Amino acid sequence: MKRRAYISEVPFDEAGSDDRNIYLTFDDGPNPHCTGQILDVLAEHRVPATFFVLGGHVKDHPDLVRRVAAEGHLVANHTMTHPDLTACDSEAIEREIKETNEAIVSACPQVAVQHIRRYGAWNADVLSRSMNAGLRPVHWSIDPRDWSRPGVDSIVDAVLAAARPGAIVLLHDGCPPDEIGNCKLTGLRDQTLSALLAIIPALHSRGFSLRSLPQ
């Protein structure tokens, strides 16, 4: 499949299986209609996670990024405007990476950005420029396609069926800037939120620990 043509080169598809750790990750935020509710659930269950934030959204909602960091979660780079980096020239790739890092650090000076993820599409140029910026490329191993709103049970079942030590779960706490006009913002990620309320205790009951990505 084209979007995974270079996935064997991405060093972080899973995060190791020595311990029974699973890593919840959230893309496309911060979003004032979603992120705070996700954070509330994570706080209730004392679960740390990793948030791959869009630089443009960070500029619009720096308070939410500060809350993410203050509550012990990892803040990571999801590019500035959500392009397919494999379709960008080298200058655009570097700009997307650099401006997002700058937006994050401007909002949260204490944050050291160490990870990047975008689209699941990678090529040699994107990988090298990400790593040259000091960022570790991250993919995922469980994708319940929560962004498509398939139903709460579908999201829960997809995660639990594929759960294994070291798994990286892809979820969403917002939507890309080019889709906001077509999104119903209120309740945008209500299925993700409801699924999370079931996923966390179910994984704990199976003996898994939930962590933010290793640094």
Curated annotation (Swiss-Prot):
Compartments where located: Cytoplasm
EC number(s) per entry: 3.5.1.-
Active site location: D27, H172
Keyword RNA-binding among UniProt keywords: no
Residues the record lists as binding a divalent metal cation: H78, H82
Limits of the NodB homology domain: 20-211
Keywords: Cytoplasm, Hydrolase, Metal-binding, Nodulation, Plasmid
Gene3D superfamilies, alphabetized: Glycoside hydrolase/deacetylase (3.20.20.370)
Superkingdom of origin: Bacteria
Protein function: Is involved in generating a small heat-stable compound (Nod), an acylated oligomer of N-acetylglucosamine, that stimulates mitosis in various plant protoplasts.
Protein name listed in UniProt: Chitooligosaccharide deacetylase
Organism of derivation: Rhizobium leguminosarum bv. trifolii
